[in-house]
Amino acid sequence: MAPGRRFRSGTWPRVKDFRTVMARTAEVRRDTKETQIRVAVDLDGTGVSNVSTGIGFFDHMLESFARHGGFDMTIETRGDLHIDMHHTVEDTGIVIGQAFNKALDGFKGVRRFGHAYIPMDETLTRCALDLSNRAYLIWKVEYKTPKVGDMDTELFKEFHHAFAMNCGACVHLETLYGTNSHHIAESGFKALARALRQAVEIDPKTGGLAPSTKGVL
């Protein structure tokens, strides 16, 4: 049996197998002619990350995502940056989504839903999500500049779409107001992370089953 985690005192009587919960980790690799990517994730970590994509601002966003989600993550991406950043950003989103989906193992035992409001100076962003295995993205985010640093702001939607589609998550992300493109981007990543942190949390009331009347997700 793989290493497990113990529930805090007081929660175990309501869990089908109260003694241990399997470690929720995954590693996914993806190699194409455009990108070579490895992602490892521990959903029950402490927010420690090792990120290298070749895009400084993107690294910063992914580090914030890991920290505020409480996920331990290793993200190694080598992409065709001599062309542009599109393949690197989108494909990284694909593999992170696949890693989360794999670690969630059929979404068994999780709270499933999560939401967060993140203020960042003049900006306020909201994320609500459902780990439904019905992938969808509602994107209501407008940037005031075409770039943040060297990164095209249009690529942030590509990342979030790729993540949602491959994680199996229904994600609604909206910036309610804001003017600084850096703040808009960062509050979006943090909102997604905080909402996911809620949604992936083990819910003892599920008894380790998928949180759905269908019995599966």
Language-model features: locations:
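Structural preference for solvent-exposed beta-strand-turn elements
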Residues: 21-217
